[in-house]
Structure formats: C-alpha cells, structure tokens
Amino acid sequence: MIYPEHYDVIVVGGGHAGTEAALAPARMGLKTLLLTHNVDTLGQMSCNPAIGGIGKGHLVKEIDAMGGLMAIATDHAGIQFRTLNSSKGPAVRATRAQADRVLYRQSVRTALENQQNLAIFQQEVVDILVENHRASGVVTKMGLTFKAKTVILTAGTFLAGKIHIGLDNYAGGRAGDPAATRLAERLRDLNLRVDRLKTGTPPRLDARTINFEVLAKQPGDEVLPVMSFMGEVGQHPRQIPCYITHTNHQTHDIIRANLDRSPMYTGIIEGIGPRYCPSIEDKVMRFGDRNGHQIYLEPEGLTTIEVYPNGISTSLPFDVQMAIVNSMKGLENTRIIKAGYAIEYDYFDPRDLKPTLETKAIEGLFFAGQINGTTGYEEAAAQGLLAGINAALQVQAKPSWFPTRDVAYTGVLVDDLCTLGTKEPYRVFTSRAEYRLLLREDNADIRLTPIAHQLGLIDEARWQRFNQKMENIERERERLKQIWIHPQSAYVDAVNQLVNSPLTREVNGEDLLRRPEINYAKLTEIAAFAPALDDRQAAEQVEIAIKYQGYIEHQYNEIERHKRHENTLIPAEFDYNKVDSLSNEVRAKLMQHRPISIGQASRISGITPAAISILLVNLKKQGMLKRGEI
C-alpha cells in the first residue's frame, strides 16, 4: 500500500540526528515525516547521560543558534551543569550537563509532537526507494510505502548492529532494540562504500549499593550556566552531584587475566572503536604503566537508582564486569543493573557525501549521524540539522547551505568527514579547528542566528532576543568608549586598586578592559563605569570582543592569508623533519607526497588545516615563502 499523503522530507530514525533533521525542515514550512521503530525512544540517550563538553558544547550552541532542540532539551533535563576550562581562554571554555534521561526524552518528544508540519509514524524502515538515481520514498516492514521528495537516513548503530558481551553476540541496534538488518542489506546494494565500526557502553550500577561516603564528590557550578541562548536557570530541575572513584592494580589484573574472553582481543569484533573513548580493556593495555584510571559515577536521573560509571566501557563477560566493578573503592558491594556491551554496526564512507550531507550517488538521499562514522550525540545532532536544512532547500529549489571551517565547528566536522573520511569513530575537539578563537561557544548566535533567520529556521521571539542582545553590546561598547578617567579624576583611586601600575595618562573604559587584570564585572563596580548590563550574554560579549580584539583580528587576517597562499610554493629542499610541531603522521605524509604548493599539501588526505598553518609559519621563519603560479 502507498500511504495517501506525500511528503517533502522523510527522516528515518528518531535519535539525536533524526530529531534535529525532522524539526529543521518542518520549521522551514515543509511537510515532514519522522519514521521510527519506537516512538517511546525518541531522543533516547543510548550511552552516557550527558550533553556538551569540550568541542561538543560548541556544537550544541551552534545547533541552538540555528533554532535546534538539543540545548533547550538539556536546560529542561540537566541535573548538573559545569563550565569546563573556566579558568582558560574563551575559545576552549565549554558547557557540559548531566541530564536526566527521562526528562530529556520527554522534552524531545514534546517538541516533536508540538511542531507544525511534522508527522510521526512508528514502523521499521526496510527499503529506500530510488528512481532514476533519486530517492523517492521508503518502504516499511509491513509493506507500507511512503513517498517523498527527499529522504534523510539517521540510523545510528542499528544498521546490521551486533551486540557483544564476552564471546557471545546477537543482532541488535542497542540493548533492547532490534537491528535494522534488512535496511542494511538494501543499502549495501547501493553504489556506496561501507565498512564497520564499533562502540561500547559500561554496565549500569545500582546506586543503593554504592558507598558514596568514601568517594570524592563532584558538584556542579555554583553559578549555574544555561545551554540555550534562550535558556533560563529557572528551567533547570533539581541539581545533584556526581562522584569519583578509580581503577587500581587489582582491577587491571582482572582485566589482563580475562583478555582471552574479550571479543576485541580474540578477533571476534572487526570494527574499530573510538580512539578518544576507549574501553577499559584498551586503557589497561595501552596505558599499563598507570596506577589507576579515574571513573566518574554519573546519576542517570532524579527518579532512578541507575548510575553510569563513565570510564569503564567494556565488552568483557558479565562475571568479569562484576569483578571489575567490585574491585573499586566504594563499589565493593555494588550490584550491576545492566551489563556493559560493545556494538558493531555499518557506516558509510563520508567521502561519498557532499558537504550538504547528500549522497553523491543518489540525489535527494541524505545521511546524518553515526552512519557517517561519527560518535557522540552532539556530532549526530549537528549533522541532522545540516541535512534537514539542505533537504528542505533542495525541495524549495534554493541554493544549498553549509558552514565553512571558519564559520562553525559544524563546518569543521563536515569538512573533515567529506574531505578526509574516517577509519574510526570521529568526534569533535577544539583542537581540530584552526580558527577556534572565532568559533567560541559564546558567539555561536552571532555567527549563525542571522543565517538561521534568512533560512526560516527561528521564530520571531528568538530573532527579537538576538537583536536586543546585539543592540546591548553595541550600546555598551560605545558607552565604555565615552567614559574617560585621567590621573586627577575623582575615580582614579578606585581604578588604581585594580590595575598593576597607577594611571599616568587618560584612558577610557575600553582601554581599561583590555588590561588582563580587569574584567567587566570589576570595571562596572567603579561608580564611573556603573551600571553593568543586566544581559549576562551581552556583557560577556563586550568583555571578550574588547579584551581579545587583537587576537580576533589576527585570526581574520589568517583566514585571508590561507586563501592567498593557495599557490604558495614549497621549496623542494624544505626539511619537514625540522618542523617539531607537526605530528609524525603528518610529517610522514608530506615527505612521501612532496607537495609543490600549500594548496596541493592541503588536499593530501590526513593533512589538516592546522598542519597547514604550522607549515606556513615555519616557511616564513626560514624565509622560504614564495608565490607562484602552478
């Protein structure tokens, strides 16, 4: 049977990629259908109960700046908020929140059900319809056909998913859910490169059997941050702490003694796991000289006894998992509620995608999330948003849109995937971005909200809030420029108490704020510069824009310089071994290929823009910068 209604966009999968992929075209006014095998797991946090972190928090802010859901859901579900790297520069500061799984899922489902132009249907998809090299719809398990102009596939770990616990394994998309076996078989028939990846999750613990009194407590921030630019602290539920324990020599001995029962170390698992979220088996074998590894005990919610032990992802047999848990301080008598496991699944080479996340082989078919080789809720959601936007633009016969590396971390993510591909689960870090001072959490709305407004992604309330913030920033900067303090001023004593050396010349508010020892809060406590802005976000922007103005201008100049250096020649005698800042991998590839220009070097697989920056700096130091035509 063909379903009587036809759609502009069909989204397959209701995880973090799928929900953002469905909401975006619906907000843009397109008739959208979200298909999921189970409506009760929409927005499910399959692994750790947390959103954000280094690099990941930046993605969440970008999603939010474009009207996405993830940050808003986190503000309503977050039970512990922290600003990571708060003592460091603004480029690497990041917001992270522990989330109540139930509250998060409820928030996501409510948003989906209340979104105009969006329909939801529960049924497993087993086939993608392709006519004349163009996606035209999907077929469900019961033979129901849905027709659409575009299709977005966000299958997560479900494609030919296989769950491993010890030497036993079975088909599954995640614990308790079936694998998408028929859909995986159908996709393998398409002209796309496919491979296998692996990820894992730790056992879940019974909080009633943990001795928290002997463990270090990790509270959230006293001044609570918010995740969304539209968020309010009052939206947060009750806040609770996490706790910290450690593995020890006994733990490591247990693991080493049972590697012959590990599916990873016996060759049963073929897929490659995430480098930056390794299993406890990998940690012990790769870092055997360590006395212990820190394990964070993260509550899964306010109304559950489940605790997530972040740091002991494992696929070892259940009896070994019990021994590992009981070997750690505070967990000597702890019971396991759910076993940890590893899962293998199909992913498709992202080099077969356009930067819009549309497949090159099949027009109108988009991939987003773990199907593209990424790991993490945030990476998936960012891809879902981008795929949803471009599916909608295609239906509207409008030009596609995707951010470049100097505009958003989403641009870094997509450029890395589509240009370099990946052989292991890819995650975002601030270190992957060469212009990270421009890509801060705090200015994601300044970078992206005007674009979102042009695309029709945000409502009038968000647009008005954004414009008010921009006006506040401009007015406050102008106000600080107009307030002058000279050495004979009545306020000079108050100023001199804050600065390292007394004033000897007339300065204005911006001059003072540029000094490292003065921040906006201290400055506006001085009567001459009072009152401070009530708008916390605007106040933060004022301080960063003034204090880092020179560095920010330098990065903009660097972007222009990179564009100019496309045809810059690399001398044949250049010695890459003398460039200590390059990784061994990058150095080896450059020596092997011997590129004749910077542009050519930048297109070698595995040579990152950050490596090109290092190369340019060293060429300049050695007086070797030459321009030429290739």
UniProtKB/Swiss-Prot annotation:
Biological process according to GO: tRNA methylation; tRNA wobble uridine modification
Cell compartment(s), UniProt: Cytoplasm
A GO molecular function held by the record: flavin adenine dinucleotide binding
Protein biosynthesis is among the record's keywords: no
Cofactor: FAD
SMART domains in the record: GIDA_assoc_3
Domain of life: Bacteria
UniProt entry keywords in alphabetical sequence: Cytoplasm, FAD, Flavoprotein, NAD, tRNA processing
Keyword tRNA processing: yes
Residues holding NAD(+): 273-287
GO CC term (a single one): cytosol
Residues noted as binding FAD in the record, renumbered to the chain: G13, G14, G15, H16, A17, G18
NCBIfam families the record matches: mnmG_gidA
HAMAP family: MnmG_GidA (MF_00129)
Annotated function: NAD-binding protein involved in the addition of a carboxymethylaminomethyl (cmnm) group at the wobble position (U34) of certain tRNAs, forming tRNA-cmnm(5)s(2)U34.
Subunit (UniProt): Homodimer. Heterotetramer of two MnmE and two MnmG subunits.
Family, similarity comment: Belongs to the MnmG family.
Protein name: tRNA uridine 5-carboxymethylaminomethyl modification enzyme MnmG
Species: Haemophilus ducreyi (strain 35000HP / ATCC 700724)
